[in-house]
Amino acid sequence: MAKPAKRVAVTGAAGQIAYSLLFRIANGDLLGKDQPVILQLLDLPQAQGAVKGVVMELDDCAFPLLSGVVITDDPEVAFKDADVALLVGARPRSKGMERKDLLSANAEIFTVQGKALNKVASRDVKVLVVGNPANTNAYIAMKSAPDLPKKNFTAMLRLDHNRALSQLAAKSGKPVASIEKLAVWGNHSPTMYPDFRFATAEGQDLTKLINDDEWNRNTFIPTVGKRGAAIIEARGLSSAASAANAAIDHVRDWVLGTNGKWVTMGIPSDGSYGIPEDIIYGVPVTCENGEYKRVEGLEIDAFSREKMDGTLNELLEEREGVQHLLG
C-alpha cells in the first residue's frame, strides 16, 4: 500500500538553487523512492509567474511520486502541515551593502518564516536553512518559533563537508566514498574549519596518508573556505546545483539515517565543545530513526581550538547584530 504523502515546503522556489532541487525532491531523492511528496512552494508576489513556469516543467516530468503542488506568496500557506521545510530563499548581498544591513534584511524574512512555521507546520517539521547567512538565519527562525523543538532547526554545512571530501579524495588518491569521519566545525562562511584529524580512507588513517600539515593549513582549509567565491569567479554565478545536492544529502541523511557514518550539520549547541548553548554551529553528527546525534568526546588540539573559536566569534558577532530584532 502506498505511503501517505509528505509535505515539503521550499522557499525561494523561483531561484537557481530551487531549480536544481525541486526535480530531485519530486524524483524521490530526498525522502526515498517509495515516499510520495506534496511540494509547497513559496516565493515573493513578483516571482509567482516564474514559479508557475517551474511547476509546468515539474508537471511535464510526470513524476510518479509527486502527489501535488501548492504555489503561494504566503508563508502560512507554504508551511501548513509541512513535514520538511527547506528555507532556500534569502536576501542576497547587493553592491555596496554592509554585512549588518544584510543581517537585518534577512532577520526580517526569517522572523516571519519562523513565526509561520511555529503556527502551522507539523510539530515534527525538519527545517533546513540554506539561504545565507545560513547559521544565523536558522538561529532567527528557531528563536521565532518557541513552540517547536529547537532541535528541529538546522543550517546547511553539508556543502562545505562535501567540498572538503572532494579535496581530500583528490589529495589522497582515495575514492570519495571511502572517506569517513570528516568534521566541519562552525559557521557556513570562509571561517569554518574542515577537520580531518579523525578521518580514515579505506580504514587507513587519512592524516598519515596525506602527511602534509602545510597543505592542510595553507591549501586545504582556505580552498574549502573560499570555494563558493572561486565558483562565482569562474562561472559568473553562485554554486546552485552543488548547494541543492548538499541540501538533498542533509535532509535525506537526517530522515533515512547515516548507518553510523559522520556527516556535518549546523545544529543548536547544547554547550559541548565550548560552544555556547543555542548557537547554530556545524558539528559532526550521525543520524538514526529521524534524529541526529552529535559525535561526542572528540579531542580538540590547540590549532583546532583556535579555528573553532574564530568561527564561533563570527557567529557571536552575527547574533549580536540581530539580537535587537528578535525582541
UniProtKB/Swiss-Prot annotation:
Q: Tell me the GO molecular function terms.
A: L-malate dehydrogenase (NAD+) activity
Q: What does UniProt list as catalytic?
A: 188 (proton acceptor)
Report the SS bond pairs.
none
Task: List the keywords (alphabetical).
Answer: NAD, Oxidoreductase, Tricarboxylic acid cycle
Q: Which CDD domains match?
A: MDH_chloroplast-like (cd01338)
Q: What is its EC number?
A: 1.1.1.37
The similarity annotation says: Belongs to the LDH/MDH superfamily. MDH type 2 family.
Q: Which HAMAP family match?
A: Malate_dehydrog_2
Q: What is the protein's name according to its record?
A: Malate dehydrogenase
Question: Species name for this entry?
Answer: Paraburkholderia phytofirmans (strain DSM 17436 / LMG 22146 / PsJN) (Burkholderia phytofirmans)
Lineage at the top is:
Bacteria, Pseudomonadati, Pseudomonadota, Betaproteobacteria, Burkholderiales
